[in-house]
Amino acid sequence: MKFLDLAKVYIRSGAGGGGSVSFRREKYIEYGGPDGGDGGGGGNVYIEVVEGLNTLIDFRYQQHFFAKNGQPGMGKQRTGKDGADIVLRVPAGTEVLEEDQETLIADLEEVGQRICIAKGGNGGFGNLHFKSATNQAPRRANPGQEGVERTIWLRLKLIADVGLLGLPNAGKSTFLAATSNARPKIADYPFTTLVPNLGVVGVDGAEFVIADIPGLIEGASEGRGLGDTFLGHVERCAALLHLVDGTSEDVVGDYQTIIAELEAYGGELALKPRITALNKIDAIEPEELAKKRAALGKVAGNLMEMSGVARTGVTEVLRVLRARVDADRKAARDALEEPDRWRP
């Protein structure tokens, strides 16, 4: 399935049906009086989070969504039928933005969440509504209210527990394939991964989700390479796993390149808990490994070592990540359970 994380959508709710001007016509009833019914309400436009989606690709093929108009009222006090609603189905993690792409309307994080993005117009009153003591036979009715037209943007930020970062060919996809059922494309050339991949990882009976983000390069924040387009997908993560290619000639420079791009991106991304791992240690001579370990340890602090191919040190890395994820989940639960303090 192709990946799309940004879509522009034009929506319109249904207009209300017009009221009816009608009079009761029956045998032997000379002055039947007004009996025009009200118009039906226009359909609403909803956005709903559903299970099983992880892309906005459906909105590439259809960008216009119109709810149905309400039916007009009829004689014999019959109200018109309401217009059918329309529902836009999106994956969890979708942000709904105004046309300026900056004003946030809603952040939809959980399956089942549903918001009304455009309310249908009200139906107009029939002439029965305008009958009074001084006007026994009104010949007026209200037209239905117009629907709402608006343009919105849908922006997907994948919901994962851990974000996987590194330069191209750092071994991110190999790590994801070795630890989960995900099958990302793996090859010996840069930018093998062009879109984010998700994988469910299990360790010691616990599971969490890792997002493999396409490789960053120096200047990504300025649009070089694939740019920093996909960094938004790790903003929701509890922790980041930064893989450094152990076979690189300058492991310190590679590490600092990614850190600089995180800081250039802005927000709280650079402040997130981060685990740094020297990858591909099975392809390095012991003496060279010791030198690179010492050099990288000076700038990265606590450094872990692993090999996605040989699976050396992988379990240890997963356990550290799991501890970070568990701590984040516990903090989220505690925040929900904490009662509001009583204030006089």
UniProtKB/Swiss-Prot annotation:
GO biological-process terms attached to the record: ribosome biogenesis
Stated name of the protein: GTPase Obg
Alphabetical UniProt keywords: Cytoplasm, GTP-binding, Hydrolase, Magnesium, Metal-binding, Nucleotide-binding
Description of how the protein assembles with itself and partners: Monomer.
Cell compartment(s), UniProt: Cytoplasm
Record-level Gene Ontology MF annotations: GTP binding; GTPase activity; magnesium ion binding
Summary of the function given for this chain in its UniProt record: An essential GTPase which binds GTP, GDP and possibly (p)ppGpp with moderate affinity, with high nucleotide exchange rates and a fairly low GTP hydrolysis rate. Plays a role in control of the cell cycle, stress response, ribosome biogenesis and in those bacteria that undergo differentiation, in morphogenesis control.
Residues given in the record as GTP binding sites: 166-173, 191-195, 212-215, 279-282, 307-309
EC number(s) given by UniProt: 3.6.5.-
Cellular component terms (Gene Ontology): cytoplasm
Protein's UniProt keywords contain Hydrolase: yes
Domain Obg: 1-159
Organism: Jannaschia sp. (strain CCS1)
Pfam family for this entry, one: GTP1_OBG
Domain OBG-type G intervals: 160-326
Predominant place of localization: cytoplasm
Family affiliation: Belongs to the TRAFAC class OBG-HflX-like GTPase superfamily. OBG GTPase family.
NCBIfam families per UniProt: Obg_CgtA, PRK12297.1, PRK12299.1
Annotated residues for binding of Mg(2+): S173, T193
EC class of the enzyme, as a word: hydrolase
Cofactor or coenzyme needed: Mg(2+)
